[in-house]
């Protein structure tokens, strides 16, 4: 099991959507705008949280820095990040399937 998988055993919603955004090259401000748009406002990310996540993802090799223009930096997901995103998607689907199989009184 890789270090990224151990450190990020599961992804928070915010982590999931940051990685989802980074399938296309974008800067932090793009992410701050896209996540609420993607989730109809259900998920928002503060700028401090976002830049902390980006730094952690860079350190773990989950994203790469693609462009630096003054203070503006752009990023894109790396293969390790793609793998984590797929694993989290599969985990969430398994969780939803468990709910469908085992729900009783709460399904009404």
Which sequence ranges carry the predicted segments?
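Intrinsically disordered, low-complexity serine/threonine- and proline-rich regulatory segments
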Residues: 1-11, 92-95, 101
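Alpha-helical transition-metal enzyme core signature, strongest for iron centers
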Residues: 31, 57, 92
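Helical "lid/switch" subdomain of P-loop NTPase nucleotide-binding domains
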Residues: 49-50, 81
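Short, hydrophobic-biased segments on the C-terminal half of alpha helices
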Residues: 51-56
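Amphipathic alpha-helical dimerization/coiled-coil segments
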Residues: 86-108
């Amino acid at each position: 099991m890789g270090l990224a998988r151990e450190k990020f055993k599961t992804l928070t919603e915010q982590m999931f959507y940051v990685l989802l955004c980074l399938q296309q090259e974008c800067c932090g401000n793009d992410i701050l705008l896209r996540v609420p748009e993607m989730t109809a406002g259900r998920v928002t990310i503060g700028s401090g949280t976002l830049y902390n996540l980006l730094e952690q993802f860079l350190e773990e090799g989950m994203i790469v820095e693609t462009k630096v223009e003054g203070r503006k930096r752009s990023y894109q997901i790396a293969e390790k990040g793609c793998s984590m995103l797929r694993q989290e998607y599969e985990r969430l689907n398994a969780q939803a399937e468990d709910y469908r199989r085992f729900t009783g009184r709460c399904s009404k």
